Structures are given as structure tokens and as C-alpha cells.
Amino acid sequence: MSSAALVPADDILEPTLQSILDQKSLRWIFVGGKGGVGKTTTSCSLAIQLAKVRKSVLLISTDPAHNLSDAFGQKFGKEARLVDGFDNLSAMEIDPSASMQDLLAAGGEQGEDMGFGLGGMMQDLAFSIPGVDEAMSFAEVLKQVKSLSYEVIVFDTAPTGHTLRFLQFPTVLEKGLAKLSQLSNQFGPMLNSVLGARGGLPGGQNLDEVLSKMESLRETISEVNAQFKDADLTTFVCVCIAEFLSLYETERMIQELTSYQIDTHAIVVNQLLFPGKDSTCEQCKARRKMQKKYLDEIAELYEDFNVVRMPLLVEEVRGKEKLERFSDMLVHPYQPPQE
């Protein structure tokens, strides 16, 4: 089920994310799950813990909803900036559609006319490549990562379906660039003459220069694609709640990650109720009974995973102090009252 190595039956895995903190070779950590399960809170908290043991950590949101700013109470954008109160933890929020428009406009004034003529054709061609929005988001990430040196990068990904596309796009973009290169070889001279008649591409570039840049991007993506499939460098943390649909999504996600050869060996189960044995809340007890059923299923299905059980908290986890308290429970298991 997991691409991580199986452990002996008598070896009970810790119910924490300590193994991720201890694995110093990790460079890419993805955090994903169904919407509304506490994915952003978990990714922020994991990044906080990593900042204690790594020289530099970058937290990136690829979710169009962008909740990092809300979680930390600080505005982030497409440029990496330090999180208040930290000297080695930075964050950024990437808008995939904006990244795509930036690429098409190439920063030139003529970009405003890109909806017409050849520009419109190129835009249609670009958007016809499956997963191209995530691919452009990834290209934006690569630009940042290449210009700034971070020891480990944590991705707060979009809800499940988009996450899996996000992990596919290195391959998708490689194929798309190969097709564009083939088109260039066939129609390059004709396209260059048409471009020349229209004043060329924005920024004064010719088609060959654009394709050369894209080929360079393809090589970088190919290298990162190989890193994604290396369990020493990359892992995926699944986040869920103890309900049927969330568990179903988690199982589907783990199966797909395994098919992509991406390591996953940790699950964070959020929003758990732990009513005390003297509790008079019948609704709490009923919900706990339901949650326990799914927790038992998780324990049976994922015996070779680190499964972290996190309580439902009274207040929202927002701001540095609350995130730090939440993050402590990722490495020091929550001790519930006696049931």
C-alpha cells in the first residue's frame, strides 16, 4: 500500500511525524487531503517543527484558496517572505492561473493583446495541455527554488483531486513541451515569419529563444520529477478525519501516490473527540463511537504508517502561538482523558 519499506510486525510505528523530522535527506514534503480536514493547519505546523531542526524551510501553498495568510495572520504572495517570529521559515502563495498569464504575457506591454491573432492561438495551445495550470504553478516554484536556497520545501496542496494532478505535471509538462518542440521543428520558419510580420513576441524574443527557455525548463522539471520518486528526498503526508468519505479519499490518494512511485508513510487524523468517561454529552459519545470505528479501520489498513491522532480543539488554530501548540502534538502524542 505504501511505497515505504514494510516494517516487522512486532515493530509498532510511532504515532507521530518524528520520523520525517529525523530524515535529514528529505527535500520535498507534500501535505494533502480532502477539503476541510485541517490540511493547511497540519502543513503550517509541520513546517514549524521542521524549522527547529533544519537551516531553512519554505512553505508553499498551491491551493487557489490560499489559507497560509489566514493561518499565520500575515499576508503572503508569490514571492517568498519570512514568517513573523521566525528567521528560517519562509512562506509563499502561488496562483496557478496568474502564473500562466504571466508566462503568456512575458511581462511585455504587448501581453495585453495576447487574446488576438497568434497570441490567442498560443494561449489556446498552452491551455489545451492537461494540467497546465498546475504545471505553471510548478514552474513558478522552480524559479523560486533555483534562485533561493532552501533545505526543505513543504507544499500545502490543493484538495485531493488537484493534488494528484499537481504531482503528475512534471510528466505532463515534459510531454507538452516535447509536442511544442515537434511543432516548432515542423512549422518554425513559418511561425517566425508570421511573428516577424506582427512585430515579434513580447519582449523582443523570437520563437527559438522561447523554445530554448522551455527546453531548459523541461530539463529542470525532468530532474525534479526524478527527485519526487526518490523516497530519500520526497514524501507525502496524508491528512484526513475519521469519517467514511475522508477515509475513502485517503485510500484512493495513497493508491495513486503508490502508482506514481511517490513515498507516503504518514497519516494525520484530525478533529477527533475524546469525551471523558463521566461526560454527559450523548452526541459526543455517539460521534466518538463512529470515529473509533474508522480509527480501527485506519489501524488495520495502514499498519505500516505513522498514524497521528489529533484532537478537535475548542478554538480555531490561527496565529503563531496556537500553531506552535498544535505542532507540538505532531511529535508528542496527545494524551486524551480516560474514556
Curated annotation (Swiss-Prot):
Enzyme class name: hydrolase
Annotated ATP binding sites: 34-41, 243, 270
One GO MF term attached to the UniProt entry: metal ion binding
Keyword match ATP-binding: yes
UniProt: Zn(2+) binding residues: 281, 284
Chief location of this protein within or outside the cell: cytoplasm
Family: Belongs to the arsA ATPase family.
Protein name: ATPase GET3
Gene encoding the protein: GET3
